[in-house]
């Protein structure tokens, strides 16, 4: 039985060690996006330069804007902006006042080409230099929302698992890490030796992470309270306890259980208050359940028809029943809804391409589109506002990386790469909101 349970974790390892082409830089597709130039009234002090540099990175790491900071000299007033030599559609002018040692007031003005007035302006007061990245992400969110009408995601977080000493018989280290969306400000929130951590998933209020782990001779599902570090075991069933995810209201989790010594797993919904279970599936190996944004359905992976594919089930059905998502999909794993419920992003193994890529299924028109082109791309997780997808890629040397791609497939960039084959990065989960 231990071999069966261990197989759940080995599956993640194998997927992560398939070959893939690592994408490590921003590449822009054919759709021309509005260009934003970030300029400053201070190009001498380190703090303004750092803030503007992070802002430019943020405004390039999305599906709707592109940015640069080509002006390397001070601009005090909007009248000094050299519009004729710029190709920019917008300029973000940042003005810094050094109030005291390590403390600034920052004024941000958004200007539009051929417009003599300020499009938008905002002031941030008493900002300590230690908050440099937080300030930059906050300004980027403001600019992004004003120029696109959509909320920015630059203050969101990513949770993921890092495995070290991968090939050691004993002493394998598992760390659950939370970082900023761009990989900075990493914090290890849980560390275990020789006890795997898998498939972390956030609660909608951002207070908890639910995950599965093999500990004390058995597999279980646990919650981690992020603020306190408190860990609570919430399942103790025989056999496989895996792939948990929270319902939108945080009152339930969906998970996969074998409930004994069978190698088959079924999807259940657990009420967290009463621990009561409702069974959603009845046959095959069913795993990786995710709730729809409205909480009325669950999407999951099943091999019931001979190969893994995506199925959808209603959470309100009296008896277990589910249907295949689309006959257009050959093999698929790890589905995730976009926040608007109009798309499902998943790991795709097409009959026309080798390896696995991240793909987007449009629930409105039924189209399937690969948005990555690697050979071992897996574990997609969607940003809280739906523009971007984080995922795991593995290159030809077997090194894993945490990467990001826009939902339209145009922009790719790297967040973190394992620096050797003895480290594995896996199971990313995007926070549900800005912090």
UniProtKB/Swiss-Prot annotation:
Gene Ontology annotations for the cellular component aspect, listed alphabetically: periplasmic space
Pfam assignment, any one: PD40
The record's annotation in SUPFAM superfamilies points to:
TolB, N-terminal domain, Tricorn protease N-terminal domain
Q: Where in the cell is it found?
A: Periplasm
Keywords attached to this Swiss-Prot or TrEMBL record, sorted alphabetically, are: Cell cycle, Cell division, Periplasm, Signal
Gene3D superfamilies assigned: TolB, C-terminal domain (2.120.10.30), TolB, N-terminal domain (3.40.50.10070)
Q: Which processes are annotated in GO (biological process)?
A: cell division; protein import
What residue stretch is flagged as signal peptide? 1-20
Please verify whether the record's keywords include Ribosomal protein: no
How this chain assembles, per its entry, is: The Tol-Pal system is composed of five core proteins: the inner membrane proteins TolA, TolQ and TolR, the periplasmic protein TolB and the outer membrane protein Pal. They form a network linking the inner and outer membranes and the peptidoglycan layer.
> What does this protein's UniProt record list under function?
Part of the Tol-Pal system, which plays a role in outer membrane invagination during cell division and is important for maintaining outer membrane integrity.
Similarity comment text for this entry: Belongs to the TolB family.
Q: What is this protein called?
A: Tol-Pal system protein TolB
In its UniProt entry, the species of origin is given as Francisella tularensis subsp. holarctica (strain LVS)
Q: What is the lineage of its organism?
A: Bacteria, Pseudomonadati, Pseudomonadota, Gammaproteobacteria, Thiotrichales
What gene does the UniProt entry assign to this protein? tolB
């Amino acid at each position: 039985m231990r071999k069966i349970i261990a197989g759940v974790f080995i599956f993640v390892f194998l997927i992560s060690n398939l070959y893939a082409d690592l994408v490590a830089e921003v590449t822009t597709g054919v759709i021309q996006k509005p260009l934003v130039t970030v300029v400053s009234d201070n190009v001498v002090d380190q703090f303004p330069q750092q803030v503007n540099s992070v802002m430019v990175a943020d405004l390039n790491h999305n599906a709707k804007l592109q940015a640069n900071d080509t002006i390397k000299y001070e601009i005090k007033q909007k009248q000094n902006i050299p519009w004729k030599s710029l190709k920019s559609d917008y300029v973000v002018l940042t003005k810094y006042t050094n109030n005291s040692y390590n403390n600034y007031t920052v004024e941000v003005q958004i200007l539009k080409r051929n417009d003599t007035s300020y499009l938008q302006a905002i002031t941030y007061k008493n900002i300590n230099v230690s908050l440099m990245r937080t300030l930059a992400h906050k300004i980027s969110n403001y600019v992004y929302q004003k120029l696109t009408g959509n909320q920015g995601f630059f203050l969101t977080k990513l949770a993921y698992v890092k495995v070290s000493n991968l090939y050691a018989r004993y002493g394998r280290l598992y760390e659950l890490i939370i970082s900023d969306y761009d990989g900075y400000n990493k914090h290890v929130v849980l560390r275990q030796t020789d006890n795997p951590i898998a498939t972390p998933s956030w609660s909608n209020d951002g207070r908890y992470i639910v995950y599965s782990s093999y500990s004390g001779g058995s597999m279980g599902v646990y919650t981690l309270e992020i603020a306190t570090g408190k860990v609570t075991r919430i399942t103790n069933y025989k056999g496989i306890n895996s792939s948990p995810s929270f319902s939108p209201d945080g009152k339930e989790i969906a998970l996969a259980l074998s409930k004994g010594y069978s190698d088959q797993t079924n999807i259940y919904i657990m009420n967290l208050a009463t621990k009561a279970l409702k069974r959603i599936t009845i046959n095959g190996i069913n795993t990786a359940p995710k709730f729809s944004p409205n909480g009325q359905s669950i999407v999951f992976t099943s091999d019931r028809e001979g190969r893994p594919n995506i199925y959808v089930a209603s959470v309100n059905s009296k008896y277990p029943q589910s249907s295949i998502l689309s006959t257009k999909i050959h093999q698929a794993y790890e589905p995730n809804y976009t926040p608007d419920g109009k798309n499902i992003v998943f790991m795709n193994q097409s009959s026309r391409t080798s390896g696995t890529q991240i793909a987007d299924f449009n629930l409105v028109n039924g189209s399937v589109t690969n948005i990555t082109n690697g050979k071992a791309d897996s574990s997609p997780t969607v940003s809280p506002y739906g523009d971007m997808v984080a995922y795991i890629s593995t290159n030809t040397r077997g090194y894993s990386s945490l990467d990001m791609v826009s939902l339209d497939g145009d922009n790719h960039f790297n967040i973190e790469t394992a620096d050797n084959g003895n480290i594995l990065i896996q199971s990313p989960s995007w926070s549900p909101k800005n912090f």
